[in-house]
Structures are given as structure tokens and as C-alpha cells.
Amino acid sequence: MASSSPLVDLVQLIARSLVDQPDQVVVREVPGDRFPRIELTVAREDIGKVIGKDGRTAQSIRTVLNAAASKAGRRAHLDILD
């Protein structure tokens, strides 16, 4: 089993704590042109829990992700896939 990046682990931990079906959470890192994209996929019925009212939960996850990436001298972008 390949080890995942700390950013992937962080998003996975946050997402699994928010959803009703944590076993359906899939997080992967995709190389980008300037910085990596972190792709988050959850069960269809949990997508609203991850996005939140007016996108506030998603924005909060992105803020934590960017803070962690910045501390490591990196940048990252979170995509929530449906």
C-alpha cells in the first residue's frame, strides 16, 4: 500500500468526520501544472454535509488545507467531486 501525502490524510480525516458513510470517502492527490489538486469524493447523500450551507463547510476545509500546505511550503487546491 502506497503512503499518502499529509494533505490527503488531513482532508480524509476531516471529510470522514463529517459524513454518515465514512467508508465511501475517497481522497486522492492529482499533480497539477503549478500545484497539486486534492480530489474529494463522498457518497451522493453526503455531498451536502461536505459542502455545507452556502459552501461554508467546503470553504472551511479549503482554508485548513491551505494552512497546512502553506506550513509545508506548498500550495494545494481542493476539488469536491460528485
Describe each region flagged by the PLM.
Residues 1-49, 60-82:
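RNA-contacting regions in translation and RNA-metabolism proteins
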Residues 51-55:
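Glycine-centered tight-turn and secondary-structure capping sites
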